[in-house]
Amino acid sequence: MGTSSDPIQDGSDEQQKRSEIYTYEAPWHIYAMNWSVRRDKKYRLAITSLLEQYPNRVEIVQLDESNGEIRSDPNLSFEHPYPPTKTIFIPDKECQRPDLLATSSDFLRLWRIADDHSRVELKSCLNSNKNSEFCGPLTSFDWNEAEPRRIGTSSTDTTCTIWDIEREAVDTQLIAHDKEVFDIAWGGVGVFASVSADGSVRVFDLRDKEHSTIIYESSEPDTPLVRLGWNKQDPRYMATIIMDSAKVVVLDIRFPALPVVELQRHQASVNAIAWAPHSSCHICTAGDDSQALIWDISSMGQHVEGGLDPILAYTAGAEIEQLQWSSSQPDWVAIAFSTKLQILRV
């Protein structure tokens, strides 16, 4: 990534190396994408298609370090009924559990990758509304890193559903908002937050399901909030994206209502945010201006004349729709734009 001021580690040997970029071209437009977490699967990602026809596709790809090519394995490419809105590998760094991949669309699905990598099988298809032929599409989900049997989903039907994937049963279903819920993020074992078309960020504690705390509301009524990122290294902070807005709002849950900082250097709508998995004060944002920007927000709360500037910037070949920061290799960020997946050393 090109430096726009001081790099994250000033003058370190890592920064002296040329930045590395690897590109994979998919046979279709990429929508959802994510990194594998397992230590034994470095540089492995899942990508999913955005096709109008039925079915869609999921591919698992991996960088071959010997020749610098990202390759797709035909055995690990499979059909998916609708375009997945999100995909996540099981948060299992130490490889103690089955190798699972989850996807959300009409239902939450869990896929098992065979130990010999010969195939991917559907393990579970989880439907929280079995009494109805109609189900509100799932807009997003998050896998609980502290308790990997728990996955939380968000839906257009205003609910958030907490699944126990080992029992394949609903733990809790909450009416979370007044309108569609667009994203959900865990902040600990029993705490999650969600954002909605009603313009609010709400925090829920599973020990007290009757109440939620409104952390933030859009300054203009009913302006949807579409994405939410919770800082894993410092859970006091979260970030959200306002629909069709070029700014990212960073919140401190101790001080509801007022953002601690607004990141305003994108030239078009922001589509994705990712907190650094290894640092409490770095966040990456990406959007329709084809830019991925990394910010150091350690000066939060101090007045910065003219607003905060990013410390790193990368310009892609088209609008960036998806962004993920690797938790197992924190010096790598992945972006997706059009039919291309790129992984970037930061």
Curated annotation (Swiss-Prot):
Entry's Gene Ontology molecular function annotations: transcription cis-regulatory region binding
Major site of localization recorded for this protein: nucleus
Intracellular or extracellular location(s): Nucleus
Sites bearing N-acetylmethionine, chain numbering: 1
Coiled-coil annotated spans: none
Protein name as annotated: WD repeat-containing protein LWD1
Knockout-associated phenotype: Plants lacking LWD1 do not show obvious phenotypic alterations. Plants lacking both LWD1 and LWD2 are early flowering and this phenotype is more prominent under short-day conditions.
One Pfam short name: WD40
Record organism: Arabidopsis thaliana (Mouse-ear cress)
GO biological process: anthocyanin-containing compound biosynthetic process; entrainment of circadian clock by photoperiod; photoperiodism, flowering; rhythmic process
